[in-house]
Amino acid sequence: MTVSFHELLLYALGMAGLWAVPGPVWVALIARALSGGFSAAWPLAIGVAIGDLVWPLTAILGLSWIESTYGDFLSILRWVAAAIFLVMGVMLIRKPAAALSADSRLTRPGMWAGFSVGVAAVIGNPKAILFYMGALPGFFTLERLTAPDVAVIILISAAIPMAGNLGLALFL
């Protein structure tokens, strides 16, 4: 492995910070947990974890080539992503999301419904897209990554949010 324990720890802390910022996944998870308890929320958390396998892999494989060609552009993109994160946070504080209706698609009963909402919530989550495409290259030198490095990064990318989501669902 070319990635150090220190780099992986910093990335895990970044993932924990990303999880702690409310977004579409939180809305879906809270809606399902409040409407059906932990048994309705855990399939969503698994769906999110599966979806969380896609973005880092896409970022690592796709951005390795892009970074080798357009490295300076990605440096600018990191700052743009940071600014967008700040704007999203301010907007969330100023105008919280509207209340969910009782017949919402987010609260449809069934394990498959919860799982599919989880996958869709993370695949379409702009916060996740910006983090993986804008910030992940700042944690690691993508050209140096080996297959075991990629496997550990993907594992961290799925495990940290899943643990947080399951913990939140248990708490609710």
Task: Annotate each language-model stretch with its function.
Residues 69-100, 157-170:
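Selective transmembrane alpha-helices of multi-pass membrane proteins
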Residues 1-4, 74-75, 87-133:
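Alpha-helical multi-pass membrane helix bundles of inner-membrane/thylakoid proteins
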Residues 2-75, 134-153, 169:
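Juxtamembrane transmembrane-helix termini in multi-pass membrane transport proteins
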Residues 51-63, 85-89, 128-129, 161-172:
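Alpha-helical transmembrane segments and their lipid-water interface positions
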